[in-house]
Amino acid sequence: MWFIVFLLLWPQTPPELDFNAYRAHVEPLLLEKRPGHARCVVCHSTGTAFRLQPLPKGQAAYSEEASRKNFDMVKKFVRAGHPDESRLLLMPLAHEAGGTEFHPGGKHWETRDDPEWKTLADWVNGGR
């Protein structure tokens, strides 16, 4: 019995956030145009604490170097293993679904069942 309690109380090591999964699944969402909203990179490449690299004119994707810089920035807004505590997922999530009250770029997801939200949550949980 004590062993089970010990295991339950033992701190869990958070999953490692994977760069390749970020580049394949997360970064495209930051570049995607959504109806009624600007692409994340439009606002987040200037004047915000969550600062992404500007996308070079005429480019549809980032270089590996720029992706690594973005990955390092995005990790600051994520609590690995805890999507429900990660600002990357909470800021653009509707308040009624557990998101923050305000996101200057609007609310991108109405529920946690949104496929984009699930993609991000999977990555935060260590998905590859």
Which positions does each model-derived feature cover?
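Aromatic- and Gly/Pro-enriched helix-to-coil junctions and flexible linker segments
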Residues: 9-128
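Sec-dependent signal peptide recognition
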Residues: 1-7
